[in-house]
């Protein structure tokens, strides 16, 4: 029932099976341990700054520091029934703000997929991307093409089935991340009068 997956970030998928009077249900629970920030080492970092492998174990505070956005760096302690908020994520949720933890340029270089994630989160939550987190994206967009195709496919699939496909695509184009990720869609959008067709198709996908 347990399967270790991932190369850079290893996690365990634990499968649970349940049933009711009418259906059988399968649920996958994702399990991982706390990780720490990778110490600088050429062995694990590509020339572009992308982290190739960082299975370094740490404590909860260290794990929070290596997360991408403040809203993703909160933990719930069921024993004390408290939310542990290391980077003011609750305040950013109240202000509807997506903020990168640490230096945005460095964090995007470490994992360029974060640029796609911030677009997906912004479209899905209708949060504003904090200016310092938004500013480096246009100049770092080329790093997306160094990411393994399997990871890009997975992230783009999440983006397109998020229920906010058109909004996500529009944000991708606004920040300069769209070219080359979906070549067929690029070709459609570059033709006069085809934008409405693409919007209709993606709106239907959202339904």
Residues covered by each model-derived region:
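Catalytic cores of the polymerase beta-like nucleotidyltransferase superfamily
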Residues: 1-207
């Amino acid at each position: 029932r347990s399967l270790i997956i991932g190369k850079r970030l290893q996690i365990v998928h634990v499968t649970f099976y349940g049933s009711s009077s009418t259906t059988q249900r399968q649920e996958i629970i994702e399990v991982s341990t706390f990780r720490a920030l990778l110490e600088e080492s050429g062995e694990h970092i590509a020339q572009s700054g992308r982290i190739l492998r960082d299975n370094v174990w740490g404590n909860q505070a260290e794990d929070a520091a290596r997360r991408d956005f403040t809203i993703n760096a909160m933990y719930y302690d069921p024993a004390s029934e408290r939310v542990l908020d290391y980077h003011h994520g609750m305040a950013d949720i109240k202000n509807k703000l997506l903020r990168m933890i640490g230096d945005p340029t460095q964090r995007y270089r470490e994992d360029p997929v974060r640029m796609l994630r911030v677009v997906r989160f912004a479209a899905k939550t209708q949060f504003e991307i904090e200016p310092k987190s938004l500013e480096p994206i246009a100049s770092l967009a080329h790093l997306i093409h160094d990411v393994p195709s399997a990871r890009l496919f997975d992230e783009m699939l999440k983006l397109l089935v998020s229920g906010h496909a058109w909004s996500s695509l529009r944000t991708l184009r606004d920040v300069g991340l769209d070219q080359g990720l979906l070549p067929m869609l690029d070709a459609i959008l570059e033709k006069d009068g085809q934008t409405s067709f693409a919007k209709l198709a993606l709106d239907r996908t959202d339904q």
